[in-house]
């Protein structure tokens, strides 16, 4: 369908890239020539994913453990990545969720999801975006949402609220950063 080198020379970061949707996106980015960075909380999962994908397709999959709730750690890791050269793409895929009746949610339960999905996505988007702005580098950001952004859903209020916030962030930054060649979609 695509030329096997359509992404050659592109550098892409996938959060939550060690499993599930993030791993599959990474697999296809590498298949089409991109150098990919994956991050997540479980280093052994990241290593296994990187090794598996490179054994299938060659290419280069770099990984680093990262708790996306930690803004300072994000800044340090993104700085390290950019020291090797600027990224061209960011996929905001890291997420967390659990099912709970809203009336039973504790503040800690709510914050556990909001810290990953809402805050973490903003922290990493801003860390990458501000470097692109400083360098005058064009880039693309894709943020993964869920259908309940539009439809609502019971028992997932922290995730629905957080994903809705990401949708608003995406639209707002598309207008703010678009004139600088930074494209955002969700």
Question: What are these model-derived regions, one by one?
Answer:
Residues 2, 105, 152-160, 172:
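Active-site loop-to-helix junction immediately N-terminal to the catalytic Tyr of the SDR YXXXK motif
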Residues 18-20:
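Conserved glycine-rich cofactor-binding loop
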Residues 34-48:
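Conserved glycine-rich Rossmann-like NAD(P)H-binding loop of the short-chain dehydrogenase/reductase
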Residues 101-102, 106-114:
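Substrate-binding pocket helix/loop in short-chain dehydrogenase/reductase
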Residues 125, 162, 170:
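Active-site helix of classical SDR
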Residues 130, 175-179:
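Alpha-helical segment proximal to the catalytic Tyr-Lys
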Residues 146:
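Residue(s) in the substrate-gating loop at a strand-loop-helix junction
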């Amino acid at each position: 369908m695509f030329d096997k080198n359509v992404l050659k020379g592109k550098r892409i970061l996938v959060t939550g890239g060690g499993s599930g949707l993030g791993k599959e996106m990474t697999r296809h980015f590498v298949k089409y020539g991109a150098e990919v960075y994956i991050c997540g909380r479980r280093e052994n999962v990241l290593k296994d994913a990187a090794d598996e994908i490179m054994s299938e397709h060659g290419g280069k999959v770099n990984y680093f453990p990262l708790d996306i709730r930690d803004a300072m750690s994000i800044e340090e890791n993104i700085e390290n990545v950019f020291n090797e050269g600027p990224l061209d793409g960011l996929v905001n895929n890291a997420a967390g969720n659990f099912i709970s009746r809203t009336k039973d949610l504790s503040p800690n339960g709510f914050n556990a999801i909001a810290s990953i999905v809402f805050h973490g996505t903003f922290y990493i988007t801003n860390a990458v975006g501000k470097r692109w702005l400083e360098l005058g580098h064009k880039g693309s950001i894709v943020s993964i949402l869920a259908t309940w952004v539009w439809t609502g859903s019971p028992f997932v209020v922290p995730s629905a609220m957080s994903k809705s916030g990401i949708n608003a962030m995406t639209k707002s930054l598309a207008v703010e950063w678009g004139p600088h060649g930074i494209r955002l979609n969700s």
